Amino acid sequence: MNDFEQGNIHYMAKEYHEASECYRRFLQQEPNNYVVWHNLGITLSQLGQDIEALKCFELPCQHNYVESWLSRGTALRSLGQYREALITFAHTFALDPKHSTAYSNYGNTLREFGLPELAIPFLKIAQELTPGNVNYELNESVSHLMKGDLIEGWKKYEARWYYQSDISLKPQLPGPEYDGSQDIVGKKVLVYYEQGFGDSVQFIRFAKVLKDKGAEVTIITKPQLYDLFKYNLPELTVLNADAQIPPYHYHVALMDLPKCFNTAIDTIPYPTPYLDVDEGMKQFWKIKLGPKTKKRIGLLSSPNKIAFISRFRRIELEQLLSITSDDYEFVSLSYEVDEQILETLAKYNVKTFHEDLSGFYNTAGLISQMDLVISIDTVIPHLSGAMGVPTWVMLTDYGSDWRWFMNRNDSPFYNCMKLFRQTNGSWEPVLETIKQELKQFG
């Protein structure tokens, strides 16, 4: 077995470091083998080394190796070089007009580039070339949602359960699934969580609509959200994810409820606030924060766990802290910090209470004492928005989540929210705008 074959085995086992070493050794013997250069390139992309991967694709692209053109476009897209990625994907389906992945990637890049309406035709072509591909269906669904066509977007949103999987990851529960057509007066409906914390906070309002329709509702939620939902949904039964499931007539996923109710952008239920904390929690934080002499502003810079897309969302802490001044009392809302972060926060006189933020109910208590929250796209603005606390969200110009829609500085989900969008890939103009608005806020 040669190094090329051994590298392929490592790659299939997701042992990317070992695979790259094998490919490099093989290329020392056959430096013009463009197929091996391609394999090294896709391996480096898996390791997050997209710039190095682009160099590997040069030789196979010169040979018009279609998969290298596709992989080159994917690497460019990962780097946020959307214009170059579009050109590369277009070259891919010019070489192979039936390459459905090239059309899908072209459409996805258009959507991330802020052009979801242009993305949809290419995503439809991908589905025509490969019928039944649920990832292509999900891409089309998200494009409709991003441009604000919620009714159309919900139709194929079921495909999310197949994201990066060949089988549905949807929980297989016994009994019928609620789809909005059944009479649920007096019926027991089980609602179970999915996706991230922000999704649960944003969409929990739809569970209350079930109650309004006469159902007895049980919510299954993540432990970190249990106390928050338990307090705010006294008319519903709230259970932890590990609790024994009680009898029910119907079950439904939380984020399927908007489809069940034919929710459009102008019929989103329960305007904020719909979440709060009890007086005891508020009093705890009043004492913890001490006497109030200035308006308080809560800050959050970057997600605690950095995922692929978060490289575009995040902002360096010191960048965000450039908006601080002596005119306000600034408070960090992050619950995961290290010594370096603590030193930086202290340098800018930002208070931190990370040791007291053990769950979202505690975090909500701290947020309840803020006059304003400024954050990038994480669970925090969803939480503060649901509480009715004035919230300013900083968004990238490319790659933003669909729920912030397009070309608007407000949110139909939260009437207390203002959106600050990049226009040139830089946070500096956004931060400058926020500095000016803070002068008026006081």
PLM region spans:
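Alpha-helical solenoid repeat scaffolds of the TPR/TPR-like class and their adjacent stem/linker regions
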Residues: 1-372, 377-442
